[in-house]
């Protein structure tokens, strides 16, 4: 990978959601691969704080319903993720969720300076353990394994190219919200943008607390975009 020039942009992971109960085997697995990954970044999805506090997982990727525990413990510029288990209070992209609940992620990523966002299900068209394939146009939950829409965000096209779901453009909106806020920060200050996010909605935006409905996000976008337009004239 170094010869190809992609090593610095490659991220490795050892185990999905290790816990204190399998910490010994996680550490053994980590020790097996570490000699071959010198200088590489290793991240692992994590829901429980203890392995991070003990220094066993140095670069955790917390779920968005546990992220505030990690932030309170000092996590800086980390990653965050959601998947099939994050269906209460927090953002996700299930088929049954309204678009604003999916889109709020962008403002959250900006406010908490998340370095990355992780999700597993781009085009998983199998049953839970990949014993056989499924037709995602008819079966959208991996045969009762996941919330509908969790395993994929695009559909297979007849020509082998992905077909957008209705949720994919909403995820793009979320990322564009984040990019707009970052750009406005470059023209003003981080404090100004944070005031815009929180004071405009009269709230303290969190991953588990955010305005319901489309108005907040639409107003935030229009206000930020108008300020950018005025500043770059």
Describe the function of each predicted region.
Residues 1-26, 31-47, 130-233:
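Catalytic domains of carbohydrate-active enzymes that cleave complex glycans
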Residues 1-130:
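Catalytic-core regions of glycoside hydrolase
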């Amino acid at each position: 990978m170094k010869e190809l020039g992609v090593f610095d942009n490659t991220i490795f992971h050892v185990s999905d959601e290790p816990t204190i109960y399998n910490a010994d085997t996680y550490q053994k697995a980590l020790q097996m691969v570490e000699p071959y990954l010198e200088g590489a970044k290793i991240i692992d999805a994590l829901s429980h704080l203890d392995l991070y506090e003990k220094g066993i997982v140095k670069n955790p990727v917390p779920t968005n319903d546990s992220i505030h525990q990690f932030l309170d413990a000092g996590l800086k510029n980390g990653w965050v993720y959601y998947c099939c288990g994050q269906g209460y209070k927090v953002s996700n992209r299930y088929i049954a969720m309204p678009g604003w609940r999916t889109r709020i992620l962008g403002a959250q990523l900006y406010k908490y300076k998340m370095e990355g966002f992780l999700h597993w299900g781009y085009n998983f068209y199998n049953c839970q353990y990949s014993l056989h394939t499924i037709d995602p146009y008819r079966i959208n939950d991996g045969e009762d394994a996941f919330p509908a829409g969790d395993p994929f965000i695009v559909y297979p096209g007849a020509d082998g190219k992905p077909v957008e779901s209705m949720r994919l453009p909403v995820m793009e909106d979320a990322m564009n919200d984040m990019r707009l806020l970052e750009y406005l920060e470059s023209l003003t200050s981080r404090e100004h943008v944070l005031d815009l996010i929180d004071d405009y909605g009269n709230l303290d935006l969190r991953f588990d607390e955010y305005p319901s409905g489309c108005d907040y996000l639409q107003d935030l976008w229009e206000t930020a975009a108008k300020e950018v337009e005025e500043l770059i004239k």
